Amino acid sequence: KVTNIIVHRTVDKVIEKELDIDNLYIINRDNNKNINMIDFNAVEVNKLLSKVINNIQNNFQNIEKGDLSKINIEELGLENYDKKNLKKGIIYRIPLGIIFNNTLLSNFGPTIPIKINLNGNISGSISTKVTNYGINNALLEISINLEINQLVMLPITTEKLSFKTSIPVAMKLIQGIVPSYYFNGIDKN
């Protein structure tokens, strides 16, 4: 839950501060201002991805260390968490029965502190999608795909958890010339 909040809030903040949608697309036009070609600006898109990943890593490292002076708790959506506990890192307390995978005892027993550590593995990619949108129009979409691996450290064992998400970054509707004649291929025999 905390990972989801931190990732989405971090992406929102980077997009809000760094993104200029018009720089993500390269549109070539002819002399009549008609669109010849649309391409994605790989340099700008990769800069955006790099900033997102670096900011997520920095936020996780600062939270793990308990260094709250370098993060904005409200910006990351962590204002409801106990700040005293956040200074120790991300720690949850779960009943002992859950650790032994026993459903009957899952809510009983003493609670055990569990510290969540980032495994140091955040990978990201950019996906693009072009969809037909009416007659001679196209909808261009750019999304950031992230995969984050974490270790949950229990007193008895450690478990690796994976978190994947795809976040839309930009959408742009490109309008082409509407033809004088359009045949949509429907054959009514």
Where are these regions (language model features)?
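Domain-level marker for long, solvent-exposed, non-transmembrane regions
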Residues: 1-189
